[in-house]
């Protein structure tokens, strides 16, 4: 029987009482004032916990936006240090987006304003200051954004906030002996919902809508109910589906959102639990029983964390009486969804997630895109306004990464060439890329362009993001050509191997700018085992060419690892016999 972990507090043999689920207040209209501030919160009996919040000492209000409305927001920084606020998932201009360049100094007010262009969905806001995102989010500066539109309003759905429509921010955190939040370690063994430990809530005996956010820094949840009842996902990150999708488990990575309908109409007086089934998480997801492999050891504290590999309770649900005018049925249809056809793409971009070099720990990180750690002064990609692009994300590390891109909602095309499950076919801004997996998605970059202010793309495991697994792109308003990596390493260029796929020989070309530069070229297999060293010597400047004959190796995926000086690049090749 799979393990079930009950997270409780015990003193002198008595259990602390459960805590009623905190439901954030709402703000609506056209003018919004947010004060970011420090505070303390009584999360445990004993020492109060130092926290941060918006318009309070912990968490922030739920902002309700109407599609087509112009909103003006004043964000005042009262936490005593620099921060930012990012409107996660929203299609807005880069100067309003709230990325790491939009720093709010202590005591100052930032004033973003924009027209809400997104469809009805559940989004959220959080800090995005480079190297401080994890701390500021984990300490509590997060809040929901609910966007409404006419299409959603015409549907027979629950939408009375806090009555039959509930926001659920799921997190796990680590605390020290004095009940203070620990940042950047891996002992996150305390589940929380809306910053409530051992949370309980009463839902009415009818159809209830859950707006679920994985607000954790690192952990992937595998959600389901203790009675294994069917629930219905009606929307993902960027909007509603064509029709509800029935399921009994939902994988939710950090920063992903899901709108769920749960039919409790026959359960008056009963109780169930919302749980994470960590015992059945997919391989490489943060939260499995162990991450140690030949490529490295698990992060410190990970293997002793009792949540990892186990099932645990997030929320106790008591089913009470129906409300007036309850919703009692699950709708059969929702809204029109028109995915972007692959034929509309004019460009495919390829990004690889790796450790900085092949010999580093591919479990703990740090991790990088295309061999380069995040640099605020480097624009990694340039996109043309109006273009439709395919982005291909290949994860060469041994841990799954939730990839997030600002500005756009995308449609997942495939995972390792396989069409994604139904609930991943809607509008998305986060996708979990498992180890040794390639995910392709398609997006159209429209409406907003700025030659100077960039958008971000990054891993949404906040520790990885802070450590450098992030890049930035600008959207240009004029079609002047694609400039991939405006600031390139000036030591080398690694050209695409040709042919690829190949049998049995492929040609690898590279360029060195300076002479007497030591260059190494190695081939690894998919498990990270060194297959062959093709080059490890000093070379003169210019273009060089090396052929690799894989005839003595089995068919499969291999990786070219090229290093010179402090720079590193790699490339996937496929031997097909």
Region roles according to the model:
Residues 120-124, 267-274, 447-456, 554-556:
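Short glycine/proline/serine/threonine-rich loop/turn segments at secondary-structure transition edges
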Residues 5-7, 11, 484-498, 502-577:
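C-terminal outer-membrane/trafficking sorting elements
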Residues 73-75, 212, 393, 506-512, ...:
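Aromatic/hydrophobic beta-strand junction motif of beta-rich domains
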Residues 18-254, 260-261, 280-282, 291-355, ...:
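Histidine-centered copper-binding motifs that mark active-site loops
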Residues 87-89, 95-100, 104, 233-245, ...:
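Active-site pocket scaffolds in enzymes
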Residues 284-288, 471-473, 569-574:
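Edge beta-strands of extracellular beta-sandwich domains
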Residues 84-86, 222-224, 402-404, 520-524:
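Beta-strand signatures of extracellular beta-sandwich domains
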Residues 126, 275, 458-460, 559-563:
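Extracellular recognition modules
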């Amino acid at each position: 029987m799979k393990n079930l972990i009950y997270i409780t507090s015990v003193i002198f043999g008595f259990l602390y009482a459960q805590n009623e689920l905190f439901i954030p207040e709402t703000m609506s209209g056209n003018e919004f004032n947010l004060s970011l501030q420090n505070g303390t919160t009584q999360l445990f009996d004993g020492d109060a916990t130092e926290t941060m919040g918006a318009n309070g000492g912990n968490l922030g209000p739920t902002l309700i936006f109407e599609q087509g409305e112009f909103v003006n927001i004043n964000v005042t920084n009262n936490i005593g240090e620099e921060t930012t606020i990012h409107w996660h998932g929203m299609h807005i201009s880069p100067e309003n987006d709230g990325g790491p360049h939009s720093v709010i100094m202590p005591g100052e007010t930032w004033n973003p304003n924009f027209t809400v262009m997104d469809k009805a969905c559940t989004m959220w806001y959080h800090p995005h200051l480079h190297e401080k995102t994890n701390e500021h989010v984990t300490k509590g500066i997060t809040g929901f954004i609910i966007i409404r539109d006419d299409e959603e309003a015409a549907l027979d759905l629950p939408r009375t906030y806090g009555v039959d429509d509930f926001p659920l921010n799921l997190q796990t955190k680590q605390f020290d002996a004095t009940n203070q939040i620990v940042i950047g370690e891996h002992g996150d063994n305390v589940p929380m919902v809306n910053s409530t430990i051992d949370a309980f809530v009463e839902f009415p005996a009818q159809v209830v809508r859950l707006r679920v956010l994985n607000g954790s820094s690192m952990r992937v949840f595998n959600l389901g109910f203790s009675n294994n009842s069917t629930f219905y996902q009606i929307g993902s990150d960027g909007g509603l589906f064509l029709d509800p999708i029935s399921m009994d488990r939902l994988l939710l990575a950090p920063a992903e959102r899901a709108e769920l309908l749960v039919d409790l109409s026959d359960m008056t007086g009963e109780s169930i639990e919302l749980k994470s089934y960590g015992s059945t998480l997919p391989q490489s997801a943060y939260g499995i029983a162990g991450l140690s492999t030949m490529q490295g050891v698990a992060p410190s504290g990970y293997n002793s964390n009792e949540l990892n590999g186990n099932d645990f309770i997030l929320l106790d649900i008591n089913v009470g009486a129906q409300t007036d005018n309850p919703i009692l049925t699950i709708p059969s249809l929702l809204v029109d969804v028109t995915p972007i056809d692959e034929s509309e793409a004019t460009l495919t971009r390829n990004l690889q997630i790796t450790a900085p070099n092949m010999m580093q720990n591919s479990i703990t990180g740090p991790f990088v895109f295309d061999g380069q750690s995040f640099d605020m002064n480097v624009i990694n990609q340039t996109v043309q306004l109006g273009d439709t692009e395919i982005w291909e994300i290949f994860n060469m590390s041994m841990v799954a990464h939730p990839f997030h891109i600002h500005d756009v909602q995308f449609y997942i095309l495939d995972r390792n060439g396989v069409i994604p499950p139904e609930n991943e076919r809607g509008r998305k801004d986060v996708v979990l890329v498992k180890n040794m997996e390639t995910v392709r998605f398609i997006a159209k970059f429209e409406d907003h362009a700025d030659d100077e202010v960039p958008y971000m793309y990054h891993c949404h495991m906040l520790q990885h993001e802070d450590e450098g697994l992030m890049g930035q792109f600008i959207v240009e308003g004029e079609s002047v050509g694609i400039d991939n990596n405006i600031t390139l390493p000036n030591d080398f260029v690694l050209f695409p191997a040709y042919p690829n796929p190949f049998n049995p020989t492929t040609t690898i070309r590279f360029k060195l700018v300076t002479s007497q530069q030591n260059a190494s070229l190695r081939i690894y297999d998919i498990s990270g085992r060194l297959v062959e060293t093709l080059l490890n010597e000093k070379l003169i400047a210019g273009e060089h060419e090396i052929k690799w004959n894989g005839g003595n190796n089995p068919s499969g995926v291999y990786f070219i690892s090229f290093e010179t000086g402090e720079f590193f690049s790699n490339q996937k090749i496929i031997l097909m016999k």
